[in-house]
Amino acid sequence: MINKILDLYTRCGKSLLDNGINDAVLPISVANEALALFSEAKWVVLGGDVYQYENDEMKNFYADWYCNLVVPSESCNYAKEHLQKLRGDNIYISFTIKN
């Protein structure tokens, strides 16, 4: 399972190192795939940060969320519901997870 998650980040992810953050983001177009993998791996999604890629840089989209659910499938569903509400071009997501 970890290999599938790492493969998704390798294929689709973008680094936030230029923003001074040691993390990576995924395009919203693969967010549901990531959430399904997290749920299958029994990882709890604690929240996430939302970015918009503009003019060759990641900018905060100010649509971050936090979740205190402890059941992996419930936390992933909460994240999915939040992300479905977002509108905009070039949206990327950074997930905060607990395994």
Predicted segment positions?
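Long, contiguous N-terminal structural blocks used for assembly/anchoring
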Residues: 1-27
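Residue-level signal for secondary-structure boundary elements
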Residues: 17, 43-47, 91-94
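Hydrophobic alpha-helical transmembrane segments of integral membrane proteins
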Residues: 34-35
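A generic structural signal for short, non-catalytic loop/turn and secondary-structure boundary residues
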Residues: 38-43, 86-90
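Acidic, low-complexity, intrinsically disordered interaction modules
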Residues: 39-79
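Short, compact, well-ordered microdomains
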Residues: 66-99
